[in-house]
Amino acid sequence: MTNLLKKFNEQQMQVLAKEVPEFRPGDDLKVTFKVVDSTSERIQIFEGVCISKRNRGLHSSFAVRKVSHGESIVSQFFIYSPALVSVQVTRRGKVRRAKLYYLCKLFGKAARIKERATYKNNKSN
């Protein structure tokens, strides 16, 4: 029974596969997704800090936090959801935790995250 479920999940992951960049908690993300109203469908952009990432195969998801009008908004996105259009990493953050839920209580300068340095591999032998 579990083999059938694993095979089904793997098939669905191949069908729903997308170009999702490598990102970690602490990174600033720009998530584009479809919003379906009763009569129309539109694309919306949610930009904020990734506060958690959950790798569970077909059920993989991540949470993004943004501050809008002084209120903290956390939104959960499934990586293999057909509603998810694209994910872009705008800035890499340097953190020491896998889950950054403590950021939900912080605002302004207290909620800042240091930028992670990225180096290019120079192999000029």
From Swiss-Prot:
Record-level GO cellular component terms: cytosolic large ribosomal subunit
MF terms in GO: structural constituent of ribosome
Keyword set includes Cytoplasm: no
Keywords: Ribonucleoprotein, Ribosomal protein
GO biological process, one term: translation
Function as written in the Swiss-Prot or TrEMBL entry: This protein is located at the 30S-50S ribosomal subunit interface and may play a role in the structure and function of the aminoacyl-tRNA binding site.
Family recorded in the similarity comment: Belongs to the bacterial ribosomal protein bL19 family.
Protein name: Large ribosomal subunit protein bL19
Taxonomic source organism: Wolbachia sp. subsp. Brugia malayi (strain TRS)
